[in-house]
Amino acid sequence: MSETIKDIKSKLQHMLSISELERSEYNNDARKGVQNAMIQRRKQLEKEQVLLDNYVKMTEFENSILAENPDALICGIDEVGRGPLAGPVVTCAVILNKNHHFTGLNDSKKLSAKQRHSIESKLLNDVYAYAYGYASVEEIDEINIYEATKLAMHRAIEGLRIKPTHLLVDAMTLDIDIPQTSLIKGDAKSVSIAAASVLAKEHRDQYMRDLGRKYPGYSFENNVGYGTQQHLDGIKKYGILNEHRKTFEPIKSLVN
């Protein structure tokens, strides 16, 4: 009696490479359901290979540092929240474990909410160290968003349980006594920065969702502080909050 298509589909999931799939006896099974299952599994493996190739490419900066110092503690740093009209700027500093692999990890802006949440859970359970840093709305208004972002990055680094030996920073240079590499669009080039990007994004989004429950009417849970029409309508109807950045337009014009 021939195997059922259901059984074959189950076995195909245990084939972990395209070459293994190509050697499979099921290539000779003429049943349409089997051939469709083969095509589907090939597409899955091709997608997984693309993700793996991208992940390997995003470890190049880390591997270069480790080649010179195998004991290096490499810390990726990124921020989220420079552009919104409300809420703090949040940063994250992350040191990954040596044998890390987080399939699909990328710049948080390129991931869906579901993908970010899944990767966040994996990161929080399997990183060497991480810490968040914040700069408040008051600090943003006092020293400007660029300086406030650097301040928040310093706070994240200081919050780590161990001092890193090399920093990979997204598009900034920090005044700190630790060797560093600044990478433009680093969250798409370095797994360490990408990890920091995801954690910072998820952390700040949760903060803004909590703020949305505290101040209904501004749609913070949807706009995370950005100047959407719903947010602007909320300002017109309910007024400006302490959580609004007074040096950002149109808030600035409304308070003067």
Curated annotation (Swiss-Prot):
Keywords carried by this UniProt record: Cytoplasm, Endonuclease, Hydrolase, Manganese, Metal-binding, Nuclease
Lineage: Bacteria, Bacillati, Bacillota, Bacilli, Bacillales
Annotated catalysed reactions: Endonucleolytic cleavage to 5'-phosphomonoester
GO BP annotations listed: DNA replication, removal of RNA primer; mismatch repair
InterPro entries, A to Z: RNase_HII (IPR022898), RNase_HII/HIII (IPR001352), RNase_HII/HIII_dom (IPR024567), RNaseH-like_sf (IPR012337), RNaseH_sf (IPR036397)
Subcellular location field: Cytoplasm
Similarity section: Belongs to the RNase HII family.
Keyword Metal-binding: yes
Residue ranges of domain RNase H type-2 in the record: 72-256
Required cofactor names: Mn(2+); Mg(2+)
Enzyme Commission number(s): 3.1.26.4
GO cellular component, one term: cytoplasm
Enzyme class: hydrolase
Note on how the cofactor is bound: Manganese or magnesium. Binds 1 divalent metal ion per monomer in the absence of substrate. May bind a second metal ion after substrate binding.
PROSITE patterns, sorted: RNASE_H_2
Record protein name field: Ribonuclease HII
Role noted for this protein: Endonuclease that specifically degrades the RNA of RNA-DNA hybrids.
Keyword Nuclease belongs to the record: yes
Residues annotated as binding a divalent metal cation: D78, E79, D170
Top-level taxon: Bacteria
Gene Ontology molecular function: any one: manganese ion binding
SUPFAM superfamilies in UniProt: Ribonuclease H-like
